[in-house]
């Protein structure tokens, strides 16, 4: 099985077999064609199905799903945010509005902490989510990550760029 995490600007992937996570890889993916997705994700033999968590949108999802179909005979399976998973209850009235990346991080954080946790993730965006001891997702926030924040500050200020 191939596990794939597609963020806003980078993709991370690893094979998972009999409880063991294989070699992990990552790359920026801007503008990749279906052939580039196939070359990147299917370097190792033996992938029989693909599971994807993606915040990259429908066009990227379609490319990855088709790449999976061409390589395995089956389209990729995409994880969706739900009302409840792994003992964690989603705080959002409309679960799909919480990014799957944040949802998976909150459920994994709760499982790893065996209770209350606060999960931070920093990439293109920076996110923070909390989960109570009894598994209630408290919500959180998303803000620009460091690079986007600096570009915003440099573009919106006259003197900051010369001092950084």
Positions of PLM-derived features:
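Conserved active-site and cofactor/substrate-binding residues in soluble primary-metabolism enzymes
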Residues: 32, 59, 97-104, 144, ...
């Amino acid at each position: 099985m191939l596990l794939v995490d597609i963020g806003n600007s980078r993709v991370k992937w690893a094979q998972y077999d009999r409880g063991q996570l294989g070699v992990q890889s990552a790359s920026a993916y801007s503008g990749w064609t279906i052939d580039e997705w196939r070359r990147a994700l299917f370097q190792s033999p033996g992938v029989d199905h693909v599971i994807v968590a993606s915040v990259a949108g429908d066009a990227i999802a379609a490319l990855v799903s088709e790449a999976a179909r061409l390589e395995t005979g089956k389209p990729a399976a995409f994880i969706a945010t739900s009302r409840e998973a792994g003992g964690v209850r989603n705080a959002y009235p409309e679960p799909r509005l919480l990014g799957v990346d944040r949802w998976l991080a909150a459920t994994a954080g709760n499982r790893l902490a065996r209770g209350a946790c606060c999960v931070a993730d920093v990439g293109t965006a920076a996110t923070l989510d909390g989960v109570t001891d009894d598994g209630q997702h408290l919500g959180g926030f998303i803000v620009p990550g460091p690079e986007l924040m600096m570009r915003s500050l440099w573009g919106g200020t006259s003197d900051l760029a010369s001092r950084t």
